[in-house]
Amino acid sequence: MVDKRRPPSPRARYIGSQIYRGRPDARIVSSPRHAPNRYIDRPRAETMSFELHLQPPGPEARAVALKELRETEENVKQGILELKKYLEEDKTIYYKTDDDFLLIFLRPCKFYAKSAYDLMKRVAEFKEKNSSLFDNLMPADEKSAILENNVVNVLNGTDHKGRRVLLVNCGKTWDPSRVSADQILRLFYLVHEIAMLEPETQIFGTVVIMDFEALAMKQVLGFTRAFSMKLLTFIQDAMPLRLKEIHIVKQPFLFTMVWQMFKPFVREKLKKRMFFHGSKMASLHTHIPPSHLPKNYGGDLPEIDYTSADWYPTLIKNENKIKEWNSYGFRKEQ
């Protein structure tokens, strides 16, 4: 929230389309409803249609960026200059170098240019190693998986901390004979390509809710060791988004078999961000309040399905951005 008693800093200026200030005009303000989290309450998701929020970060986001990401005018300018230099010197990889695009990689790396450059190389390596899954991947390639198979959805709005929420149904509605685990990974990839375009999502990050209700052996067998390694490599090494939390809900005893497959590849940093709630929605609500969850998870919002009809048009609308992303990575030999 901006302190209106003070005039705007004369040092305020734009870098790309983002505004930065010489002093932190924004600060996090306690909310009576979410005082423990110290974040301003946000509109309930049901009041928002699914659309990308591409405007520059607001006061709350700028305050979080300053506190958590070292996002000062000086660090932004220096990070962009250094990252451009790394990319100019490396002739093996290709990414565009406009300021706003580079922020996608600098923000999760707290504006350390070398770390952002290393992330760009890992993204290129992941795409090359899994080219059969991701080369020229477009939304239409997975239209049926998205619209007809009730596996992946994205909440229309954000949660109370401004984070995008991805919902994955790995239980009763997932038929591995119709949508493979690798296809689920392709859906994740398409969603992340769009989510990372939002400046505030770059700052606030994302949350994943994985629903294992009525998990059966056909779903357990749908997960493979190879898939678990690919998924965790993507999440931990090659995703330029801040993954803040993963919530496992409604998991039966059979889930132990799935977890044993993934557990060896989960690093300590990710383990600390994973929460296992079972059927106790009150446990989930300590992280995301009912006001920002659908009825499926003890929330106040209407019950949802997983057809993804709300956000598929957003993918189609931004196909040009997805095509651009497909062109990035290691340069192809002529």
Question: Where on the chain are the PLM-derived regions?
Answer:
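Basic, amphipathic alpha-helical/coil surface patches used to engage anionic, phosphate-bearing ligands
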Residues: 2-334
